């Protein structure tokens, strides 16, 4: 994708982390959405952080961002490299020890999070950063790219949890969803946390430092 510098829009985000499947899914709309999201990041001058794979939706979104001239950081556990890296890689690939380190590293380098359609791994990454936001570990926006209603059932489940008193009404606002990349990124730009955190980000950072110093 060639991008005219005059059409580029300045974003408040330097990097966005994208969670998505290592499969392409059965619908071409999922694949189109991955490419559209990559192109939207390029148009807004945003770099990509993702799971490092070159297959599935991961490969499509990373290739689109790379082809548009933006920086790509892929974070992948060493044990998954033979499975999720095929052919030529794009951008910067950072090998880590395990899945926990992968998620921490992706979060550390990102200003916001977006989940494309995906499976267990995508859901686990998504729910963890939502939980981190609720706990006050970060205040970064979290978005669902709800392609063809893929996440409708998940959103209904979360609304049920609110109805039954397991998630507060304010914490429900952590999750932002939209059907298109353009609309979703715009909503993320406008996001302002309105939920009450369990602890402040500073408290979490101090606890982490103190815990590490005991080793």
UniProtKB/Swiss-Prot annotation:
UniProt keywords, alphabetically: Cytokinin biosynthesis, Cytoplasm, Hydrolase, Nucleus
Expression sites by tissue: Expressed in roots and shoots. Detected in root procambium, lateral root primordia, vascular tissues of cotyledons, leaves and stems, shoot apical meristem, axillary buds, young inflorescences, fruit abscission zones and basal part of ovules.
Main location: cytoplasm
Gene3D superfamilies found in the cross-reference section: 3.40.50.450
Cited Pfam families: Lysine_decarbox
InterPro entries registered for this protein in UniProt: LOG, LOG_fam
Residue positions binding substrate: 84, 102-103, 119-125, 131
Activity profile over pH: Optimum pH is 6.5.
Domain of life: Eukaryota
GO molecular function, one term: cytokinin riboside 5'-monophosphate phosphoribohydrolase activity
Gene Ontology terms: cellular component: cytosol; nucleus
Effect of a null allele: No visible phenotype under normal growth conditions; due to the redundancy with other LOG proteins.
Reactions this protein catalyses: N(6)-(dimethylallyl)adenosine 5'-phosphate + H2O = N(6)-dimethylallyladenine + D-ribose 5-phosphate; 9-ribosyl-trans-zeatin 5'-phosphate + H2O = trans-zeatin + D-ribose 5-phosphate
Cell compartments where the protein resides: Cytoplasm; Nucleus
GO biological process: cytokinin biosynthetic process
EC number per UniProt: 3.2.2.n1
Cited function: Cytokinin-activating enzyme working in the direct activation pathway. Phosphoribohydrolase that converts inactive cytokinin nucleotides to the biologically active free-base forms.
Family of the protein in this entry: Belongs to the LOG family.
NCBIfam families found in the cross-reference section: Rossman fold protein, TIGR00730 family
PANTHER family: CYTOKININ RIBOSIDE 5'-MONOPHOSPHATE PHOSPHORIBOHYDROLASE LOG4 (PTHR31223:SF74), LOG FAMILY PROTEIN YJL055W (PTHR31223)
Protein name (Swiss-Prot/TrEMBL): Cytokinin riboside 5'-monophosphate phosphoribohydrolase LOG4
Name of the gene: LOG4
């Amino acid at each position: 994708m060639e991008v005219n510098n005059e059409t580029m829009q300045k974003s408040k985000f330097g990097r966005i982390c994208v969670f998505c499947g290592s499969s392409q899914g059965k619908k071409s709309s999922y694949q189109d959405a991955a490419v559209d999201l990559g192109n939207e990041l390029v148009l807004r001058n945003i770099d990509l952080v993702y799971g490092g794979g070159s297959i599935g939706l991961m490969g499509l979104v990373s290739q689109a961002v790379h082809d548009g001239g933006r920086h790509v950081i892929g974070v992948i556990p060493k044990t998954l490299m033979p499975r999720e890296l095929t052919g030529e890689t794009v951008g910067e690939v950072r090998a880590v020890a395990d899945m926990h380190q992968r998620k921490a590293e992706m979060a550390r380098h990102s200003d916001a999070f977006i989940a494309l359609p995906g499976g267990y791994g995508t859901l686990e990454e998504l729910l963890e950063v939502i939980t981190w936001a609720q706990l006050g570990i970060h205040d970064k926006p979290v978005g669902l790219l709800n392609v063809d209603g893929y996440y409708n059932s998940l959103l209904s489940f979360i609304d049920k949890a609110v109805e039954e008193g397991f998630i507060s009404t304010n914490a429900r606002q952590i999750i932002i969803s939209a059907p298109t990349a353009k609309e979703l990124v715009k909503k993320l730009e406008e996001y302002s946390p309105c939920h009450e955190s369990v602890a402040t980000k500073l408290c979490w950072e101090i606890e982490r430092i103190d815990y590490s110093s005991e080793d």
